[in-house]
Amino acid sequence: MLEASLHDGSTIEIEVHGAGPTLLLPVNPQPITGPQAEAMRQWGADPALGYSLIQGLSDAFRVVAFDYEGQCLRLPKPETLTPANVASDLLAVAAAVGADRFAYYGYSWLALIGLQLAIRTDLLSALIMGGFPPLNGPYAAMLRVTTAAHEMAVEAAQTDKAVSEQQPAVEAGDWSNVQITVSPDQARQFVTLYQALQGFDDRAAQEHITCPRLCFAGSEDEIQYGPKWGDVLVSIAGPIRAGHTELKSLGWEVRVLDGLDHLQAMQAEQVVPILRSWLASQIRS
């Protein structure tokens, strides 16, 4: 098993599947099973998403899979999950597999860190951002959401009542009633990330992206949080639709997936055809 050393001194396991142009995928390569898998299905998520992406891409690409989000949850980085450090971590993964050129695909906050990588290296052969706009990104809204999550995690940690006992059943994609199941340190690291991005000018950053790039989102990707979250709206599709013309002028290929929300647009049946066709037209072995 290959490993890479990350900025905090921890190591992350890496799986490599297939041959061809290298594609970094920050996903869990192993299907999740048991109660956690059932909870994910009820929420509308796929517990085998990473596995499905690998299966759908590894016949055409050298897929480098590593569970970066899972590693951050297992070994939180409450003070050090900064844009520069996450970019350094991604480069460490590429170095560990001997990739001097590679494409990167990430979804949601893992797309965001791909953008941070792209402006810090010339090693990218292509960048695909799903579920997060590369222009006019919701950085302020996400700071409010992650701050609220941290506050609720601290409150839960200070009570005797188990987190699992506090959770009513939720419907798939019901962001207004989403429950906090993470520790204060797990939540704090994302506050650190979005705090560091409050001064980030994603329009000015565009000139530093030198590789082919594509962004996509579901047309219904508008995440409305409830009162305990400050009634925050995290708009993903809005900036992509409104900025479609400008994004294309800046070199982006833009896809809006009709009728899909944040969870639906990340599923393998949506993502694999996009990545296969577009990457095949942009990069060669």
Describe the residue ranges of each PLM region.
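A short loop-to-beta-strand scaffold at the N-terminal edge of the catalytic core in hydrolase folds
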Residues: 7-17
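Short beta-strand element of the alpha/beta-hydrolase
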Residues: 21-35
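Conserved acidic catalytic loop of the alpha/beta-hydrolase fold
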Residues: 84-102
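Flexible "cap/lid" loop of the alpha/beta hydrolase fold
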Residues: 112-119, 123, 127-155
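Active-site nucleophile elbow and catalytic-triad environment of alpha/beta-hydrolase enzymes
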Residues: 134, 187-205, 237-242
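Short beta-strand/loop motif that positions the catalytic acidic residue
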Residues: 209, 215-217
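Catalytic active-site module of serine/aspartate enzymes centered on a nucleophile-bearing elbow/loop
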Residues: 241, 248-285
